[in-house]
């Protein structure tokens, strides 16, 4: 039976500062490193053994995966990285303080930019220090497909081809697949797997550093409800994510 393990990266330095991060490459905070280590301990304690790893191209997801797999004694498994698993591109909001952005735009527009399904923030200018123009990570990617801003709908559009064409093959061969990625790329994947509506996806918050497990059937649909390896910590973490921007 295919098994999928989703891990949102641990707290990053910009999560700690309450900044919109998106495609800006920042590292894990000290707390984030601890969360990643705990994720690995949970994998080992619960006997969930990934056979192959997928991550985004961003350091915080890569760090999380490396720390977790070392704790789980699985650092040796094959690794694949793709920009298609990157966080949502937050456009002109990248690098901005969430609380200040809330004050500037008001709660309705802030929530629209942050949580609506199909409304992206204003695009980032190529001259911005938080733009990815010229970033070496993407030098082999067609520049016409690289975003300057994204909604969750656009994240799903660029994520699903990679899921269907690449990740699915490992799952269908019976492997346990671990994906270490980001709040919005993982929300998009969970939406696809669970058939969550465009309206209801706004309510889904994925906590940092706690493995979420899907047991899938031969059609890669959940054969039972998904579950966190630490449900109590996951509930508290999801509530903290929901409150971001309010301090």
Swiss-Prot record:
Predominant localisation class: cytoplasm
Entry's family note: Belongs to the phosphoglycerate mutase family. BPG-dependent PGAM subfamily.
Residues recorded as bearing Phosphoserine in the entry: 12, 116, 127-128, 185, 197
Resulting phenotype, residue 169 to P: Causes dissociation of the homotetramer to dimers at low concentrations
Quaternary structure note: Homotetramer: dimer of dimers.
Listed name of the protein: Phosphoglycerate mutase 1
Alphabetically ordered keywords of this record: Cytoplasm, Glycolysis, Isomerase, Isopeptide bond, Membrane, Mitochondrion, Mitochondrion outer membrane, Phosphoprotein, Ubl conjugation
Origin species: Saccharomyces cerevisiae (strain ATCC 204508 / S288c)
Matching Gene3D superfamilies: Phosphoglycerate mutase-like (3.40.50.1240)
GO cellular component: cytosol; mitochondrial intermembrane space; mitochondrial outer membrane; mitochondrion
Cross-link (Glycyl lysine isopeptide (Lys-Gly) (interchain with G-Cter in ubiquitin)): 31, 57, 71, 139, 175, 191
Activity regulation (record text): Inhibited by inositol hexakisphosphate and benzene tri-, tetra- and hexacarboxylates.
């Amino acid at each position: 039976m295919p098994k999928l393990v989703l891990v949102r990266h641990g707290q990053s330095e910009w999560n700690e500062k309450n900044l919109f991060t998106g495609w800006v490459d920042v590292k894990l905070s000290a707390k984030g490193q601890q969360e990643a280590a705990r994720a690995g301990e949970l994998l080992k304690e619960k006997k969930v053994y990934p056979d192959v790893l997928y991550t985004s191209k961003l350091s915080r997801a890569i760090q999380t995966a490396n720390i977790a797999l070392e704790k789980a004694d699985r650092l040796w498994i094959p690794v694949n990285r793709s920009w298609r698993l990157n966080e949502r591109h937050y456009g002109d909001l990248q690098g901005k303080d969430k609380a200040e952005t809330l004050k500037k735009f008001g709660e309705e527009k802030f929530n629209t930019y942050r949580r609506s399904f199909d409304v992206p923030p204003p695009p980032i200018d190529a001259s911005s220090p938080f733009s990815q123009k010229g970033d070496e990570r993407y030098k082999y990617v067609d520049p016409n497909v690289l975003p300057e801003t994204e909604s969750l709908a656009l994240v799903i559009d660029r994520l699903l081809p990679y899921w269907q064409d690449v990740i699915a093959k490992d799952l269908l061969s019976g492997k346990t697949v671990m994906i270490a990625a980001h709040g919005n790329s993982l929300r998009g994947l969970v939406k696809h797997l669970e058939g969550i509506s465009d309206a209801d996806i706004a309510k889904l918050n994925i906590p940092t550093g706690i493995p979420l497990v899907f047991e899938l059937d031969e059609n890669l649909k959940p054969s039972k409800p998904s579950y966190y390896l630490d449900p109590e910590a996951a509930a508290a973490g999801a509530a903290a994510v929901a409150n971001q921007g309010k301090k």
